[in-house]
Structures are given as structure tokens and as C-alpha cells.
């Protein structure tokens, strides 16, 4: 008998869509931290346990979410960044599609505690693997705390493709390093399995971030770059000839504050240094 074409149930559709956003724990951390950045936070604390599978906690001092908007924030395509299609041409935020929270809460237990500066109290709200709870008032500081637990517990097929906890934690550590480097004006405090990994000051000095994430020897072996021509600004740091590696793990490129992998730019940088490091 032929299989009939049918419309997927919302539950199945949400789990499939979640895989596009919440591919692995590092994807979840990325979405939550970018939300914190978009909220205007200048202090972000990220804590993970068991490679982010057991726990991901992201706390920020951003503007928070008004209590009446919290349940809406977990709906698909719910965003404060867009109103019309024309707005797509003027996006300056890290995210805008309104898919992250709905996708994450479909495959995890998600807890939010948030408060705006204008509110007398905050709000506490839980979505447990797609099942919404009730919003309650809570005493808390301004900003938002997002807690994600038991990631992919209801999607065994997705869990099967994850690597061991230490490897997943490594992916998150790489991500946090790039985020800290891309936003030196934000203080990042990163904790893994109860142990502090690094904490940046948020003073805007990229060299200070490098010192915290790569160490003193690395920080002493870089020099600043600041160049502007034809409306294009290039800034950052490059390593001195004695600071060379056999791969691109320490080569990090950002365009308008976003991390990218671009073989053309990478190749140009390598060619420029070829004679210096040989």
C-alpha cells in the first residue's frame, strides 16, 4: 500500500525544526548568548555541565523581557527584531528569525527568569520539552537567566549523534573564546563543570581578552592592526613571526562582529606571513 502524504503533527514538526537550530549543545549556547548580546548586556555568565547536555545556564544583565511577553517569546517566529520584510535590510542584531527559543524548548527543559528595569518584580517561566507551564512572579535582578536542562532527552536519535561530554564541552569552549574575542566590550564569565575557564573584563581592550583566553605568552606575541580604506575598516591583532602554528585553530576572523570561516581571507593572511614564518 502506498504511503499517504500527510501533514506532520506540531510535535513532530517542532522536533525536526529544532534540529536546524539546536544541532548540539554549542548551538544552544550560541543562540542564548547572542540573545543576551542583543539585549544590551555588558556582563554574561555561561555555565555548562556534562558538555552542555545536563545543564546550560546563561545569565545576563541586559534589558530583560516584559512579563506579559515572556510566553510569546517561546512561540515560533516570535521576535522583537522584525515587523516587515523591509526590516531585513536593516538588521544589526545577532539574531532576528524568532526560532531559537521555540526550537530549544522542543528538545529540552527550558527555564527563564527575567526582569526589566521598570518592573517591580521579575517573572519565572518553564517550558518542559514543549509543554508550557504558568508564569510566576519572582524576586530577581534586572536581566535574564536562561537554564536549559536534559537537552535531547526526548530525541534519542539526536542524542546518538553527540560526541562524548568532553568533546562537546570543547566545542562550547571554542565558541566562548570566539564570542569573547568578538565582543571585548562585554565581560564573559565561562564556567565548565564547576571550574572557572576564563573571565574577561569587558573593558574593550582586545589584548586583555587574548590574555585571558590564550595566556600571557600568546598576548605578548601579538601586535595591533588598525587600517581603514574605501569605507572598509580592518582591526584586530596579528601574531609576530615567532607566534606560528601548523593549523588555523588560532586564526579567527570576524565580519561586523560575527565569526566567519572564509578561505579567501585565510589564504591571503597565510600568504602575507609565508616568508616571515619560514
Locate the predicted segments by residue.
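N-terminal phosphate-binding caps/lids of nucleotide- and nucleic-acid-binding domains
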Residues: 2-278
Amino acid at each position: 500500500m502506498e504511503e499517504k502524504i500527510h501533514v506532520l503533527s506540531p510535535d513532530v514538526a517542532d522536533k525536526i525544526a529544532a534540529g536546524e537550530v539546536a544541532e548540539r549543545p554549542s548551538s544552544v549556547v550560541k543562540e542564548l548568548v547572542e540573545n543576551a548580546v542583543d539585549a544590551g548586556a555588558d556582563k554574561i555568565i555561561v555555565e555548562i555541565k556534562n558538555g552542555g547536555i545536563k545543564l546550560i545556564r546563561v545569565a545576563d544583565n541586559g534589558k530583560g523581557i516584559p512579563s506579559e511577553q515572556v510566553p510569546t517569546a517561546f512561540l515560533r517566529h516570535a521576535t522583537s527584531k522584525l515587523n516587515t520584510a523591509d526590516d531585513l535590510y536593516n538588521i544589526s542584531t545577532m539574531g532576528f528569525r524568532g526560532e531559537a527559543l521555540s526550537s530549544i524548548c522542543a528538545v529540552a527543559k527550558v527555564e527563564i527568569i527575567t526582569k526589566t528595569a521598570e518592573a517591580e518584580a521579575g517573572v519565572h517561566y518553564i517550558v518542559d520539552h514543549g509543554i508550557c507551564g504558568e508564569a510566576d512572579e519572582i524576586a530577581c535582578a534586572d536581566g535574564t537567566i536562561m537554564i536549559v536542562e536534559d537537552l535531547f532527552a526526548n530525541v534519542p536519535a539526536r542524542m546518538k549523534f553527540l560526541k562524548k561530554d568532553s568533546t562537546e564541552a570543547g566545542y562550547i569552549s571554542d565558541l566562548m573564546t570566539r564570542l569573547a574575542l568578538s565582543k571585548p566590550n562585554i565581560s564573559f564569565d565561562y564556567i565548565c563543570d564547576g571550574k572557572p575557564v576564563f573571565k574577561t573584563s569587558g573593558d574593550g581592550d582586545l589584548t586583555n581578552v587574548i590574555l585571558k583566553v590564550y595566556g600571557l605568552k600568546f598576548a605578548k606575541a601579538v601586535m595591533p592592526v588598525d587600517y581603514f580604506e574605501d569605507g572598509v575598516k580592518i582591526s584586530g591583532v596579528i601574531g609576530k613571526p615567532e607566534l606560528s602554528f601548523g593549523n588555523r585553530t588560532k586564526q579567527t576572523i570576524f565580519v561586523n562582529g560575527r565569526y566567519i570561516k572564509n578561505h579567501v581571507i585565510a589564504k591571503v593572511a597565510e600568504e602575507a606571513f609565508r616568508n616571515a614564518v619560514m
